[in-house]
């Protein structure tokens, strides 16, 4: 998804998207591990783009869902290589309510370093709630947001939507 359907937004910001094989939008821990091992085993890796984060979506654009076991395996690979796991939660409300998933919000917080809870696809006017698991918010995060022109004046009002969506389980 992020490699082709976001108009190059990641690369526009100066980062490089390195793809691994996908299967209906999902990646496998084994493929990820092979990709990372290949990178680190290459004697010239110091001259290459370093893998800096793993990005997954739940549900994917194909509607496929990760299982708890898959999420745990991918997280384990990320932690063994000391790179964060990011979960795109634009459709997270739908994924958590699916009868086909065994993934819960606490599991996502346990296995992912960063994720966001999408709002617009579940009834919010706009916005996503970014969650840094385990109190790992980057240093000076608010300043970084402002430097990139993404800090909205009175933006805290958008948070009220999420407070409401989490009341009486309206989010899912």
Where are these regions (language model features)?
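Catalytic PLP-binding core of fold-type I/II PLP enzymes
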Residues: 66-98
């Amino acid at each position: 998804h992020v490699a082709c359907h976001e108009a190059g937004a990641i690369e526009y910001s100066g980062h490089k998207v390195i793809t691994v094989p996908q299967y209906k939008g999902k990646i496998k821990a084994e493929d990820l591990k092979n990709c990372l091992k290949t990178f680190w085993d290459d004697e010239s890796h110091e001259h290459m783009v370093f893998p800096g984060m793993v990005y997954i979506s739940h549900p994917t654009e194909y509607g496929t869902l990760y299982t708890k076991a898959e999420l745990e395996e991918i997280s384990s690979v990320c932690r063994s290589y000391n790179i964060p796991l990011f979960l795109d939660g634009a459709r997270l409300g739908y994924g958590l309510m699916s009868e086909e998933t065994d993934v819960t919000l606490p599991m996502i917080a346990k296995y992912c370093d960063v994720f966001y809870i999408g709002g617009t696809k579940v009834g919010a006017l706009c916005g996503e709630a970014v969650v840094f698991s385990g109190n790992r918010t980057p240093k000076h995060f608010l300043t970084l947001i402002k430097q990139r022109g993404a800090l909205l004046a009175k933006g805290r009002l958008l948070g009220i939507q999420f407070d409401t969506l989490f009341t009486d389980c309206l989010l899912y």
